[in-house]
A protein has these predicted regions:
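Catalytic cores of alpha/beta
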Residues: 42-49, 107-125
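Flexible glycine/acidic-rich beta-alpha junction loops that bind and position SAM and/or redox cofactors
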Residues: 13-14, 63, 68-74, 104-113, ...
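Conserved SAM/AdoMet-binding glycine-rich loop
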Residues: 1-107
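Short, hinge-like loop/turn segments at secondary-structure boundaries
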Residues: 20-22, 50, 117, 146-149
Length: 168
């Protein structure tokens, strides 16, 4: 299995299609894991992905949260409706395995917000739904805003958030 762990892999749709086509033309027996931004998958790319032999590609999609305010707070705005459209289309084609990620403990996310995110993402029927606690890595903008944002975290690796102003 070959993993490409760059969540901006498909930020340039033409480049992503070229790489997908290269793989499909030469490596149909290999397995590839991509981190992608599903809201950036356009119709042309989705049509190309209809050609993928089942089990060849797995997409890891970092949804993080389905709350717009939370996504803005972590500088990860996403067109959730477009993301959901892409995931539904990929799911209905049944060719790409879908691994969707949510993060617990994000600033601004209440317990009910987080449960709503789980419900909304689970409704997409991904092959795998992963929930992680947010980590405040040194040098990141989120860690820089931790105290003012009401985040308490373990100062030792992996720097897991222990409480937020909304969750304890």
């Amino acid at each position: 299995q070959i993993k490409l762990v760059d969540r901006t892999f498909n930020a340039d749709p033409d480049r992503a299609r070229q790489l997908f086509r290269f793989i499909l033309d030469r490596h149909r027996r290999s397995h590839f894991h991509f981190e992608i931004a599903a809201h950036l998958l356009d119709d042309e790319t989705l049509a190309l992905l209809d050609e993928v032999p089942p089990g060849t590609f797995q997409f890891e999609i970092g949804v993080q949260s389905t709350q717009d305010a939370t996504l803005r707070a972590i500088d990860r705005p996403a067109a959730l409706e477009r993301l959901e459209h892409a995931v539904r289309r990929l799911k209905s084609a049944g060719r790409v395995k879908l691994h969707l990620d949510l993060v617990a403990g994000l600033p601004g996310d209440s317990y009910s917000d987080f449960l709503a995110s789980i419900d909304r993402v689970a409704a997409l029927s991904p092959d795998h739904l992963q929930v992680e606690l947010v980590k405040l890595l040194p040098g990141t903008p989120l860690r820089g805003r931790a105290v003012s944002g009401g985040l308490r975290f373990d100062p030792n690796p992996p720097y897991t958030v222990l409480a937020t102003s909304e969750l304890t």
